[in-house]
Amino acid sequence: MANQKCDELIELIGLQRFYIESITNVMAETGKKWYDGEIGIAEEHMITNIMRKVVEINNHKIEVKGLIEGVVVICNPGGDDHTMSNLVLEGLLKIRKYKVVNIGGNWYMDENTKATNTAIINFTIETRPDIVFISVTIARYLFNAKLIAKELSKALSNTKVFLGGLGTQGVFEGELQNGILLANKDTLNTLNNL
């Protein structure tokens, strides 16, 4: 039933608008309700899991036909395992004919921060992407994301390396090392200027 309603809405407004307007608003409202104590963490996780499934199903339906625009790696720093924004970004990039390699997810820091960073960096370098998006949802992982971005911008001089997400609020372009770009808070603006 829920998938049918989503499909009807996507048919009406298009997948991009569905992701930007509907999914983003549901997740923002859910986060606000959790933060304000109106719902518990279990309810927040349930809603997130439902929305994640909806996005994953629709991402798998996107067919990239013809020449691709380039290869994009999406990742997040160790410890920041909020993958919802990565999945939405993946779909928006696939709509624009990019081949997307999404390695965001459950990277746990513990004592292995350096090993985690190295794994992310090495995989990304081996992939040789045209663009890298490092998504930071929680600000405490921003330092780690900047370390990854710094290494990638040195190793992949012809690759655009973007740092973005809720965890980058308050960061200014001038604070970032040369070769690292701050993704616009308006996701579509960033994507339209690739």
Where are these regions (language model features)?
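Long amphipathic alpha-helical segments
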Residues: 1-63
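A short, charged/proline- and glycine-enriched loop
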Residues: 66-72
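Cofactor-cradling patches in redox/metallo enzymes
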Residues: 100-101, 108-172
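Short helix-loop-beta junction
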Residues: 88-102
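Peripheral docking tails and interdomain loops at the edges
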Residues: 161-194
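ATP-dependent carboxylate/acyl-activation modules
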Residues: 53-55, 83, 92
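Residue-level signal for short, function-critical loop segments
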Residues: 76-80, 106, 138
